[in-house]
Amino acid sequence: MTSRKTIAVLFGGRSGEHEISVRSAASVVQGLSVVHDVLPVLVDRRGGWKLQQPGPGVSGEGGTPVFLVPSPSDRGVLRRLEDGSVIARPDVYFPVLHGTFGEDGTIQGLFELAGVPFVGSGCAASAVGMDKAFMKGVFASVGLAQARYRVLLHYQREQARQVVETLGWPVFVKPANLGSSVGISKVKRAEDLDEAVDLAFEYDRKIVIEAGLDAREIEIAILGNEEPEASLPGEIVPDREFYDYDSKYSAESRTELRIPAPLKEPEVRAAQEIGVRVFQAVDASGYARVDLLMDRQTGKMFVNEINTIPGFTSISMFPKLWGAAGLDYDELLSRLVDLGLERHHQRRGLRTDYR
């Protein structure tokens, strides 16, 4: 395990998942503070960075405006926006940013330009893991089973009915670039399709229409870099039609998390193997949660998606799956810091010259 470090935790962000990010960061900052010195950095809804008081707490507002220079020569320091003076010197950056401008490769690209160590996947893996259309194309290229789907761009809106005639009912209509089930609808009738398509296009210029499966929702937590490990599977038993935003985050939700999932040993092994294949297919690093669908009649496993920055509250599926394996929350966070440093050192060893 790494020695005590100064870790900048970025949270909030310019996305529909801003509040979820704040919740995750509250748990992450508290857990990291057991071993490390933590600098909470709020990314507000306009994209401004606000350095908050060091310690185990976070706030959804307030802080000193700061910025990071995208050059290795500046050594990853945080500077005051007001006068450019150095205010903090993080050793590692830990993005706990869900959705666009945080989980989609943009912030990871900034970290890579700045030459700083950071937790999680790099720019390309994050971008693929965020965009459901690109993600599904990558999965198909390595032979991973998926539900049938079609991708529509905003100018193809009128093709939605034709797509559903091919896929059959029910269908899921999803924004291509958003998580936490924001903007997703399950549609069973033709008269409800336009409303679902309009909602999805409010969040993205590209949407995915996917055939609905009668399936159990199985999740796998993956940890590692070049030799990733898979947790035992967990199962989501939602309290409504599907695992939507309210099922995930509402205090009134009665959604059940089964850890471990009640599966036969061959099913457990199959889920773990698929989880690792998915992680490696997008070239992920550090950690991810892989969501699978298991057909209730045949038991066949289908890949739903990979989440390269999964929810990280103390009751979220990712930490709970590793907790069931004996890796407690604080230890898990320190392991992620170690993996981020490991990836950084590997990348620093690569040549950047031609001759």
Where are these regions (language model features)?
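ATP-binding N-terminal substructure of ATP-dependent carboxylate-amine bond-forming enzymes
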Residues: 1-124, 128-130, 134, 141, ...
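Active-site nucleotide/adenylate-binding loops and adjacent lid/helix of ATP-dependent enzymes
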Residues: 2-11, 15-16, 23, 84-87, ...
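ATP-dependent carboxylate activation and anion-phosphoryl transfer catalytic cores
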Residues: 2-5, 11-14, 141-143, 264-355
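Hydrophobic beta-strand scaffold residues
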Residues: 38, 117-118, 146, 171, ...
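Conserved hydrophobic "DFG−1" position in protein kinase catalytic cores
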Residues: 80, 222, 292-294
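Phosphate-binding site of ATP-dependent enzymes
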Residues: 188-273, 296, 300-302
